[in-house]
Amino acid sequence: MNLELENNPLGNYAHWILRVVLATTFIMHGYPKLGYDMGMGFVGYFVGIFEVFGAIFLLVGPFTKDIITRVGGLMISIIMIGAIFVVHLGQGWKMHATAESIPYTQGFEWQALLLGVSLLFVLKGNKT
């Protein structure tokens, strides 16, 4: 049985799994920053805009020009680079889930994964 994407008719739709999961993640984390004071000030509002619009661009990208997908991926990549360097880098790679460490001792493994997926869309666009 040959499972190569080129010969698999469902392979043409595989990118939707990444798009929908990544977009849902960023919409769910971004929209609260747009309407509520989360103690982040202007930066939080800016981050929320990038998260929500980056996600929307990823979802509408396949129906529009390739650049929309790339810009959406870039917006999310910028947020993830900021999150890694400003918040998570000093906490190491692994996430730590202990009662004493919650909520702010998470390593950057999750953010690195999200950065990698978003960079895929920056580099490949709609050809993902």
Q: PLM features: residue spans?
A:
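Extended, low-polarity transmembrane helix blocks
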Residues: 1-36, 44-49, 53-56, 60-128
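Short, aromatic/His-centered strand-loop micro-motif at the edge of beta-sheets
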Residues: 39
